[in-house]
């Protein structure tokens, strides 16, 4: 689960699965679950015969609320460089990429509250399958179905929204996808093909025809929103920094600023932990140095 650790007089630290907290002797502290999560941990004590925990006063509701709120609102101001809708896209995309359905569920409700329609949110979840696979995309959609059903049962309005517009371009899907990729990346269509495209031409055709034509041409999301979603999904998947380099470069080419990408990573850090955000901060730093 997700929890908090706080030493007396210090800010609360948000902790995630896999985190290790080392506590020196005689440090007054508390730890426990985040407001929206369960939390379990293993404690390893050195010198157990002489080293014992001393239980002090309980943490009051006011102390707990103040500590967790300060941590959760750490990036609230800086993240305003992204619109509420964009912040919602980042949250649901990163949770989907990781496969964290427990926290995806409230994030989906927040996306509806941010003004997104059912069809627009579905589009983010559909887009996700190209980067994290059908299983996580479909499980995210099933989770969204639960959210919509529960809101309906509580009398809450869920606007469905419009459908994607029909494609009127008469060019082949490959040509359309090729042109979309050139537009969003700034790489000319006659540039030398990447090594993978030469080695496995079929995947290059699928990328052009399906990803950049069938998906990117659907106008329920802008190119900008799709790339914010893509980077967020890749952050949730983890370990795919070479892919993130390409898509973060596309973000910058589309006019998304380094500050806005940093805000995206702030959201990933708060929701998933630094294990997921820090590798991409390194990518962003390298890209901005090269500009």
Stretches found by the model and what they are:
Residues 10, 19, 116-120:
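Winged helix-turn-helix DNA-binding recognition segment
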Residues 223, 240-244, 248-249:
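Strongly charged, low-complexity linkers/loops
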Residues 86-98, 225-240:
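Amphipathic, charged-and-aliphatic alpha-helical interface segments
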Residues 17, 246-248, 254-268:
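Extended hydrophobic/aromatic segments used for targeting, binding, or gating
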Residues 1-17, 27:
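A short beta-strand-loop-beta hairpin characteristic of the jelly-roll/cupin
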């Amino acid at each position: 689960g997700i929890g908090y650790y706080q030493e007396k007089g210090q800010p609360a630290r948000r902790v995630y699965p896999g985190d290790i907290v080392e506590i020196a002797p005689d440090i007054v502290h508390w730890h426990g679950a985040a407001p929206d999560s369960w939390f379990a941990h293993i404690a390893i004590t050195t010198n157990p015969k002489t080293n014992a925990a001393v239980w002090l006063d309980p943490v009051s509701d006011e102390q707990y609320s103040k500590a967790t709120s300060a941590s959760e609102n750490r990036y609230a101001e800086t993240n305003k460089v992204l619109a509420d809708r964009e912040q919602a896209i980042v949250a649901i995309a990163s949770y989907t990429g990781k496969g964290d359905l427990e926290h995806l569920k409230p994030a989906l409700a927040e996306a509806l509250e941010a003004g997104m329609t059912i069809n627009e949110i579905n589009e983010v979840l559909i887009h996700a399958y190209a980067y994290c696979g059908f299983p996580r995309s479909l499980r995210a959609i099933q989770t969204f179905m639960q959210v919509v059903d529960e809101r309906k049962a509580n009398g809450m309005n869920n606007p469905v929204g419009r459908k994607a517009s029909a494609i009127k371009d008469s060019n082949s899907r490959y040509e359309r996808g090729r042109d979309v990729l050139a537009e969003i990346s700034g790489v000319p269509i006659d540039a030398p093909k990447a090594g993978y495209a030469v080695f496995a031409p079929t995947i290059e055709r699928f990328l052009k025809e399906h990803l950049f034509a069938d998906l990117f041409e659907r106008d329920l999301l802008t190119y900008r929103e799709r790339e914010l979603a893509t980077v967020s999904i890749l952050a949730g998947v983890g370990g795919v920094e070479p892919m993130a380099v390409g898509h973060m470069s596309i973000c910058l080419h589309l006019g998304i600023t380094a500050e806005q990408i940093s805000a995206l990573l702030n959201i990933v850090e708060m929701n998933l932990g630094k294990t997921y955000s820090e590798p991409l901060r390194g990518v962003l730093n390298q890209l901005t140095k090269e500009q």
